[in-house]
Amino acid sequence: MLAIRKGSATKGVAMYEIEEPEVPEGWALVKVLKASICGTDVHIYQWNEWSQKRMKPPVTIGHEFVGKVLKVNKGTGRVQEGDIVSAESHVVCHVCRMCRRNMYHACENTRIIGVHMDGAFAEYIAIPEENLVKLPGSVPLEAGSVLEPFGNAVHTVQSVDVRGKRVVVTGVGPIGVMAIPVAKALGAVEIIATDLSDYRLKLASDVGADVVINVKEQDPVQIVQDLGGADVVLEMSGSEKALNQGLEMIVPGGEMAILGLPDNRVSLDLANNVVSKGITIRGITGRRLWETWDLGVSLVSSGKVDLKKVITHQFDFKDYEAAFSAMMSGNSGKVVLNVSQ
């Protein structure tokens, strides 16, 4: 089969012809139909410090996909041959203290598909059956391919109370953009998006942002404060400046959820912007298993969230270099590879 792999500890990836994967007991074989490129895949492509610490090539990359189940080896009946599925990319241990506290998303021994084990940028993938999520027919294949990162957006919004609130999303990359219709669907009355890119702000507006602010041209703190302040801030950028601006915007007693990962340590005015204002801050990782998936699939299958608006580029599987270029250009939403029919 064809697979896009990190063949060696250098920049770039390549397509290889490799054997189809074996299917251990309790695992399933899935034919990959569509797969989307994540920021993690870009890190691996660029072979930055994050990927060098976590990956030992050769590994087939990719962890966001939709596919068809071809075989289940002594499974539980969770999925059947022929089912259309997406998948949770974190393979958990079930025995660490986090798993035993029903916090599987924070498993201390997590292995990530496409990082620690062969992933989904291949014609076929072997994956634990328990990680598969059966999709109803009302979920388009394109949407199915981005449900995993959509889950990050859902988890972030779920972690705070947006009902009847003014919500600011700082950083509207693909996951920040996806958080906007989720917040809208869960009851936010006004959503403000901030970013450096007019392209991304246009995408944010298209999916439901009421106000968009290019922080290179306008003062987001002043604008939001003039509107009455932010009840909730979703920090999706990883920018120290955006994080501090978000804290300045929040009204006393407000909430912030942080999904964006800064490259380095950050400096905050805790005394004035957090403690004195009584702000609650939550760090977000992964997706809660399985509440996040249940809500995410429901939002898409019911039509409350249209993920096709977030998918801006699609490429043939063999045109993966062009797909990575589009993803790294900064002028894209989600980029999808059409792997097979």
Task: Tell what function each PLM region has.
Residues P21-A35, W50-R97, P136-S138:
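Glycine-rich beta-strand-centered segment in the early N-terminal region that forms part
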Residues C93-T170:
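NAD(P)H dinucleotide-binding glycine-rich loop of Rossmann-like/cofactor-binding domains
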Residues V160-R163, K202-T280, E321:
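Glycine-rich cofactor phosphate-binding loops and adjacent beta1-alpha1 units
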Residues M1, E240, N244-E248, W290-Q341:
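C-terminal hydrophobic helical "lid"/dimerization subdomain
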Residues V139-E217, Q222:
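Mid-domain Rossmann-like dinucleotide-binding core that forms the NAD(H)/NADP(H) cofactor-binding site
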Residues A3-E22, G39-K71, S86, A106-H116:
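N-terminal glycine-rich cofactor-binding segment
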Residues E255, D269-K309:
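Rossmann-fold dehydrogenase core element
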